A protein has these predicted regions:
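Conserved acidic donor-binding segment of nucleotide-sugar-dependent glycosyltransferases
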Residues: 361-362, 366-374, 382-388
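Acidic donor-binding loop of glycosyltransferase active sites
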Residues: 318-332, 345
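Conserved donor-binding/catalytic core segment of Leloir-type glycosyltransferases
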Residues: 194, 234-253, 259-263, 276
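Short hydrophobic beta-strand element within catalytic cores of glycosyltransferases
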Residues: 346-349, 359
Length: 431
């Protein structure tokens, strides 16, 4: 098959891009021809298709009034993207199009490329976040509270609650985008939506998507991650034990809750146990101030190591005693947890979104209530006791590795996905 994969970012930015590039790798292993459609950017990985990538767009920086008007229009519908995608389709002649992150920088205008209708090309969309039912995509309102207000299709709630970064203008633009896509029936042009978690599928159905349009397929792990899980070597740093948070330092990730909980626990924790925070983001200064205010002991026991390469992150995950997923928002199917499991590192995870589908109390980790310092504090104390019980800890490590090997096979995912591709091709072409 010839497959076009679509994603706004063409470099390893986050979990969506891990999936996007992993998909290309897995499909090529099976002998399929893969092409890309993305946004231009200085960090992009080289691609033979880059001459048709869309112009870079940044909706977060300061802009003049004419720029804002232009941005508002192209955010909702990009004529440039439609025309360039049509040119790519004419050149590649795809059998299937598989979209990932496309809203705002690319837009769903590409679904109007005439080639798709003329040649009955099936389109899939992997739902990495909640943009299909929430203009703010994380199902949090402007105050950072969990929010289901737009599930009934009334997207004016986004503007009313200033859900996008507390900004009336940005929330209004997001609302207009959602209303426009609903009015045009854009999502009806997608043949299958892939939900990586059962929770995601349930929310899409609550948001009005037909059950037959949404298929659950848990994300896969790349082969090197699977190889790491199969290796089974315990690389935990027993001499210098630490808990590990890795990810974006943002409010929805709950890193502030984690720091507060760890500081609260310091008098009760083993003297050697540290907290390592890997990543960067808007909450970094707040976290640094919390640590400094807590005094010298906290400063000695909490380390911010900043952004880490993939290789460095794997080393951190392998050596950590426990990883922490303290999210406030409804995470979909976090790759960070799968990568920790593959390293034999159990996880303390918030009971929210798709996290409980991965982190099961007493089996693959420990659980806590989202955004609750006391609950996370108690989970950390339970984790400290677990680490000291080497037999119970080793059993949990084995459970984590088994989960990845049994549930996250790249080969099986690719075979299931290509079978779905073929089913849609046959259906659309009347075979």
């Amino acid at each position: 098959m010839k497959i076009i994969l679509v994603n706004k970012f063409h470099y390893l930015k986050g979990g969506s891009e891990t999936y996007y590039f992993g998909l290309a790798e897995g499909l090529r292993v099976l002998g399929h021809e893969v092409h890309f459609f993305a946004m231009e950017g200085p960090d992009n990985i080289s691609s033979e298709d880059s001459d048709l990538f869309v112009s870079a767009k940044d909706y977060n920086g300061p802009t003049s009034l004419p720029q804002k008007v232009s941005a508002a229009t192209s955010l909702i519908y990009s004529k440039e993207a439609k025309e360039k995608f049509q040119a790519l389709c004419e050149r590649v002649q795809p059998d299937v199009v598989h979209m990932n992150l496309v809203h705002r920088q690319i837009t769903l205008s590409i679904l109007d490329a005439p080639y798709l209708k003329q040649h009955r090309v099936p389109v899939l969309f992997t739902s990495h976040d909640y943009i299909l039912v929430c203009p703010n995509y994380v199902m949090l309102d402007g105050s950072g509270n969990l929010c289901d207000a737009c599930l009934d299709g009334h997207f004016g709630n986004c503007l009313k609650r200033k859900c996008v970064k507390g900004s009336t203008a940005k929330s209004g633009m997001a609302m207009l985008e959602a209303e426009y896509l609903k009015l045009r029936g854009s999502y009806k042009k997608i043949d299958r939506i892939v939900a990586p978690s059962q929770f995601m599928r349930e929310k899409l159905l609550e948001g009005g998507f037909p059950a037959q349009q949404v298929v659950y397929m848990q994300n896969f792990a790349k082969q090197e991650i699977l190889d790491n899980a199969a290796d089974g070597t315990d690389r935990t740093d027993w001499d210098n034990p630490y808990l590990l948070f890795f990810g974006r330092l943002s409010s929805e990730k709950g890193v502030d809750v984690l720091v507060d909980a760890f500081i609260k626990d310091l008098p009760s924790l083993p003297a050697k146990l540290r907290l390592v925070i890997a990543g960067d983001g808007p909450e970094r200064q707040n976290i640094e101030e919390k640590i400094a205010a807590a005094g010298a002991v906290a400063s000695d026991r909490i380390e911010l190591v900043g952004f880490q390469s993939s290789a460095d992150m794997q080393r951190h995950a392998e050596k950590a005693s426990l990883a922490i997923a303290s999210s406030r928002w409804r995470e979909n199917m976090p790759y960070s947890i799968v990568e920790a499991f593959a390293s034999g590192t159990p996880v303390i995870g918030s009971e929210i979104g798709g996290i409980p589908e991965l982190v099961v109390e007493g089996q693959t980790g420990l659980t806590c209530k989202p955004g609750d310092v006391d609950s996370l504090s108690q989970a950390i104390l339970r984790g400290a006791r677990l680490i000291e019980n080497h037999e119970a800890y080793a059993a949990m490590q084995a459970n984590c590795r088994s989960y990845v090997l049994e549930r996250c096979s790249q080969e099986k995912y690719m075979k299931d996905l290509t079978a779905l591709y073929q089913e849609l091709i046959d259906s659309k072409k009347g075979n």
